[in-house]
Amino acid sequence: SVHRFFRTFAKNQEYNMRIGIIVAMDKELRQLLALLSDTIEEKSGGKTFYRGRMSDDKELVIQQCGIGKVNAAIGAVEMINAYHPDSIISSGVAGGATTLVPRFHVVASTDVVYHDVYCFSDNAYGQIQGMPERFAADRKMLEIASKIENVHPGTIASGDWFVDTKGKAGEILDHFPEALAIDM
């Protein structure tokens, strides 16, 4: 579960840094706030941040950004400007793309691909012109996350439209059969 993931991650002595977490929805925010102690609600740049401690004095800053890649990017920039975290984790609910990952397990991205982008044949499907095909995860964080029970490292396909049918999921998996999870 996400609780076990963040508790275990925060206890890891190899990673003694300030971690920022961005989430899209209120339900995701409430789950994470339940893990913090000494929580302080702060406002910066018109945004609300929650700063607190989890396990052994590890400081976390959490923000609910709203749904979509643009909101996540804006939230990450606001968090960087206000708190200067060493790392930012985007956390949230995603659809399972394979039966290899049981329900309620965590997928830690090795890389993220866009499932809703096509910039013609000069680029790979999902690649924005001038950008990489895939966005790689931080190797040190991935190494730590991979040691946690019920965490599965793999590709996450992310986009800005809700994948609400098996047909849509199938189209995404036609392009990215290695994906373990589909975001939105």
Whereabouts are the PLM-identified features?
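Generic structural signal for well-ordered, non-membrane alpha-helical segments
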Residues: 21-25, 29, 69-72, 134-142, ...
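Short pre-catalytic strand/loop immediately N-terminal to key active-site residues, enriched for Gly-Thr
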Residues: 61, 176-182
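Proline-aspartate-enriched helix->loop->beta-strand connector
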Residues: 84-89
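Short, Lys/Arg-enriched N-terminal segments with co-localized hydrophobic residues
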Residues: 3-16
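Mid-sequence, gly/pro-rich, charge-dense loop/helix-turn segments that line enzyme active sites
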Residues: 97-177
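Alpha-helix C-terminal capping segments
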Residues: 78-82, 98-101
